[in-house]
């Protein structure tokens, strides 16, 4: 989240995607089954991203390119992705999701609550997603199936001008999850949420993780975004079980990591 930054070459607190790439490489060497995702606010916020969005349109955005080169599994769009307008965002998405090459891999995109505005509104839902992006993916690791759902921030309509999110209907987060909940439970042993949201509600209703976890009992892990805080928060679900929420910081200063150990015989896990 928020990978790019303005940084001095002096000092010892270096950040950036080269260090993240090294860490990811180490994790993949140690663990066979790794899922790598990003929770948004990736292509806006610095002179570098502005330059490639507006001045160097014929060259791939470096933030998108590095995700492809690092073989990311999923990207969830953040609210700042819409600041440059839909044309620029769509260009970035088209590149990110283009077919793999010898040096780059296609990256999946998921925002289950971003729906096609042509067929979804406040009164009607057919749950067709914007751009037909998958509402979630199922990954199988040594016989264990994991559902990973991306959820975008629904408050973008209050932050950006309408032309910047033209064609999207923003559905409620809890409503969206519960629409797919039974389907994911039937298909997967574990359910993970990657979302561009903070944890606790605010007056703008842009942070909804506590509401989501505390009103359900099927989510096993959440990766947050939006607040750009760093740390782990545990939230009790409706069964009283504490679910970890990992907040992965900002500007590639830290990497949020969860390690699942799953017992197929008892269908239980530690994280």
Regions found by a protein language model. Give the residues of each.
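Acidic, metal/ion-coordinating pockets
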Residues: 1-271
């Amino acid at each position: 989240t928020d990978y790019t930054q303005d940084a001095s070459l002096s000092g010892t607190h270096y950040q950036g995607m080269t260090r993240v790439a090294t860490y990811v490489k180490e994790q993949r060497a140690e663990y066979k089954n790794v899922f790598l995702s990003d929770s948004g606010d990736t292509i806006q916020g610095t002179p570098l991203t502005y330059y490639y969005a507006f001045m160097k349109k014929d060259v791939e955005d470096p933030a998108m390119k590095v995700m492809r080169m690092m073989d990311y599994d999923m990207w969830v769009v953040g609210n700042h992705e819409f600041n440059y307008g839909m044309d620029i965002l769509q260009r970035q998405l088209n590149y990110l999701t283009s077919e793999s090459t010898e040096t780059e891999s296609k990256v999946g995109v998921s925002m289950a609550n971003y729906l096609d505005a042509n067929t979804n509104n406040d009164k009607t839902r057919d749950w067709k997603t914007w751009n037909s992006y998958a509402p979630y993916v199922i990954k199988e690791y040594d016989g264990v199936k994991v559902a990973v759902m991306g959820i975008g921030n629904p408050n973008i309509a209050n932050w950006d001008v309408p032309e910047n999110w033209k064609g999207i209907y923003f559905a409620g987060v809890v409503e969206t999850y519960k629409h797919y909940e039974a389907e994911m439970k039937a298909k997967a042993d574990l359910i993970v949420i990657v979302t561009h949201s903070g944890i606790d509600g605010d007056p703008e209703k842009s942070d909804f993780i506590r509401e989501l976890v505390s009103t359900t009992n099927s989510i096993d892990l959440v990766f947050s975004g939006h607040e750009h805080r760093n740390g782990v928060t545990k939230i009790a679900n409706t069964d009283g079980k504490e679910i970890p929420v990992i907040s992965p910081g900002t500007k590639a200063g830290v990497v949020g990591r969860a390690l699942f150990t799953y017992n197929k015989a008892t269908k239980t896990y530690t994280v």
